[in-house]
């Protein structure tokens, strides 16, 4: 019959700190390992894990030949009125929408590019 991890953890949780320290020392000797991890190596590991970006910004760089289609996309995406959307499009390069998720940003960029505009996600 083998001992499960849960049984081992339950047994360790009932031990005193002094006995746990002795157990760790015995494990280190038995398997020729060290439990000493320097703070610098832990920080290095954490620094290597890149943070995934969750908020994106879509920027309109150039209108292209189909200005009316771009204005329609801006109106439907931002909820702005016709005049505000037109002014926004004519002020390119400009930010269209900020703090949106990746899927929405990709969709908006694709729609703008399909309509002849130049757009980017930042």
Curated annotation (Swiss-Prot):
What terms describe the molecular function in GO for this protein? mRNA binding; structural constituent of ribosome
Source species:
Buchnera aphidicola subsp. Cinara cedri (strain Cc)
Highest taxon in the source lineage: Bacteria
What GO biological process terms are annotated to this protein in UniProt? translation
Q: Which family does it belong to?
A: Belongs to the bacterial ribosomal protein bL12 family.
Gene Ontology annotations for the cellular component aspect, listed alphabetically = cytosolic large ribosomal subunit
- Please give the subunit comment from the record: Homodimer. Part of the ribosomal stalk of the 50S ribosomal subunit. Forms a multimeric L10(L12)X complex, where L10 forms an elongated spine to which 2 to 4 L12 dimers bind in a sequential fashion. Binds GTP-bound translation factors.
User: Which NCBIfam families does its entry note?
Assistant: L12
Which of UniProt's keywords are assigned here? Ribonucleoprotein, Ribosomal protein
* Listed CDD domains: Ribosomal_L7_L12 (cd00387)
One matching Pfam family: Ribosomal_L12
Under which name does UniProt file this protein? Large ribosomal subunit protein bL12
| Function of the protein | Forms part of the ribosomal stalk which helps the ribosome interact with GTP-bound translation factors. Is thus essential for accurate translation.
């Amino acid at each position: 019959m083998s001992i499960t991890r849960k049984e081992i953890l339950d047994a360790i949780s009932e031990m005193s700190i002094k006995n746990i320290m002795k157990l760790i020392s015995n494990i280190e000797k038995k398997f020729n390992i060290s439990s000493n991890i320097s703070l610098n190596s832990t920080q290095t590991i954490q620094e290597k894990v890149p943070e995934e970006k969750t908020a994106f910004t879509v920027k309109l760089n150039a209108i292209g030949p189909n200005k009316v289609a771009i204005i329609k996309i801006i109106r439907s995406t931002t909820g702005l009125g016709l005049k505000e959307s037109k002014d926004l499009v004519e002020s390119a390069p400009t930010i269209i929408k900020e703090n949106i998720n990746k899927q929405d940003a990709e969709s908006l960029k694709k729609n703008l590019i399909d309509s002849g505009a130049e757009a980017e996600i930042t």
